[in-house]
Design a protein with these regions (language model features):
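CBM-like, beta-strand-rich accessory domains located in the C-terminal region of large
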Residues: 2-168
Length: 168
């Protein structure tokens, strides 16, 4: 169950959930790279995931895995249709240490957007400045993320999986 609900699910990949729903495990939900360029000082990529959140997984292999795990592909489990109409992600890297992610998001109705950002170390959250920072002392890496948006949003973190990992 952990493999389907956490490891493979959109929620595990620094992406968005729309009303708690991620992408299906299906070729019917897809994305594409619209633009890409790389240079000595700057790199850029534009991805379009507008069609990536399209219903449930209907591939017989995945249907079998869900059945075997006793998991229904319903919104409460993060699967189903969404009113998403536009999801374009711009990623700009100013070499060597700055990455800017800008998402263009639209839906046909009011939705709850969730951006799930992952780190092997705990985030320090400053809700006033809308920043998250993390320091991985083992690897010698520091990351600071500042969030901008046109709507009020909340910041939170957890160290829990939707379905805990079990060793069998």
């Amino acid at each position: 169950a952990h493999n389907l609900m956490s490891y493979r699910h959109t929620r595990a990949h620094n992406s968005l959930l729309v009303n708690g729903i991620g992408q299906p495990y299906s070729t019917e939900g897809y994305g594409s790279v619209m633009r890409a360029m790389g240079g000595q000082h700057i790199s850029y990529c534009l991805g379009d995931a507008s069609y990536a959140y399209r219903g449930i997984s209907n591939d017989p292999m995945w249907v079998g895995y869900f059945k075997q795990a006793g998991i229904e592909q319903v919104p409460e489990n993060g699967f189903g249709a969404t009113p998403l109409t536009k999801y374009r992600r711009h990623v700009l890297m100013l070499h060597p240490h700055t990455v800017i992610v800008y998402d263009e998001l639209e839906a046909s109705e009011v939705v709850r957007w969730e951006w799930l950002l992952h780190s092997p170390t705990e985030f320090k959250i400053d809700a006033t400045k809308k920043t998250l920072s993390t320091n991985n002392k083992t690897k010698g890496l520091v990351a600071v993320t500042q969030l901008f948006g046109g709507h009020v949003f909340t910041l939170s973190q957890t160290d829990r999986f939707v379905v805990p990992h079990t060793i069998t």
